[in-house]
């Protein structure tokens, strides 16, 4: 039986870029002799826990792999599998060759998932930013994490609103849920400026002061 890689198969796709990207991902998985384990999804956001549980159920070995839907596999992640660690993979941007600080693919041993990760999963939207904060920090807390470069490429495109904008509800939901998990487990918190809904007005006097100071400094330099 072939080793399986799970990712969301989104249909209908919200845009042509993603439609092409997920097809290229599927082809890259098959080119490495692996089997795509598709998680059927629509254009709406999906909870990360649902995707990972699907990946675990679909596992044909002692490990499972999950990745984002718009990367391209260039090497077989199962080649470095070991039962003692979760492995995270940073993407390389194409065509720039820049390495991304975030993690877009994970190889997870079934035993670590069953006995540890699955027992306390924060309620994160996949695609809503910072899911890698949990999947990286949770195994790191028990000394069971290692990161790698050189396994996945990512054709560059403009950032999505859900991934970076602090006013985006999916972004803010993920930050809240991650921080709740982090407090329970003694991990580092994500800090973002507090903003009023809709109008985006800052609720933090410290943030206001720092923003004012930066504007003042830029103004002084321009004189």
Where are these regions (language model features)?
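N-terminal anchoring/stem segment of glycosyltransferases
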Residues: 1-63
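C-terminal catalytic/acceptor-binding lobe
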Residues: 3-21, 25, 125-223
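Short loop/turn segments at strand-loop or loop-helix junctions that form parts
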Residues: 5-12, 41, 69, 89-92, ...
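Structural alpha-beta junctions
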Residues: 27-37, 84-87, 140-147
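Generic structural signal for helix capping and beta-alpha/helix-loop junctions
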Residues: 46, 96, 155-156
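A short acidic (Asp/Glu
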Residues: 48-51, 75-78, 158
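Short beta-strand-to-loop acidic/aromatic patch adjacent to the donor-nucleotide binding site
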Residues: 61-74
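Conserved catalytic core of nucleotide-sugar-dependent glycosyltransferases
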Residues: 71-138
């Amino acid at each position: 039986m072939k080793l399986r890689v799970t990712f969301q198969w989104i249909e209908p796709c919200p845009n042509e870029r993603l439609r092409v990207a997920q097809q290229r991902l599927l082809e890259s998985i098959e080119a490495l002799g692996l089997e795509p384990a598709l998680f059927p999804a629509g254009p709406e956001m999906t909870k990360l826990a649902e995707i990972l549980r699907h990946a675990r159920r679909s596992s044909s070995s002692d490990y499972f792999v999950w990745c984002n839907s718009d990367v391209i596999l260039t090497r077989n992640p199962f080649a470095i599998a070991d039962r003692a660690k979760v492995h995270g993979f940073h993407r390389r941007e194409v065509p720039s060759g820049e390495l991304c600080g975030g993690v877009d693919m994970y190889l997870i041993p079934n035993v670590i998932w069953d006995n540890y990760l699955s027992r306390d999963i924060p309620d994160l939207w996949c695609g809503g930013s910072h899911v890698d904060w949990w999947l990286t920090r949770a195994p790191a807390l028990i000394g069971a994490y290692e990161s790698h470069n050189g396994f996945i490429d990512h054709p560059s495109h403009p950032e999505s609103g859900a991934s970076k904008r602090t006013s985006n509800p999916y972004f803010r939901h993920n930050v809240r849920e991650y921080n709740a998990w982090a407090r329970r487990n003694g991990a580092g918190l994500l800090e973002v400026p507090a903003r009023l809904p809709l109008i985006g007005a800052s609720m933090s006097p410290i943030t206001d002061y720092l923003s004012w100071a930066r504007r003042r400094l830029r103004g002084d330099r321009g004189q």
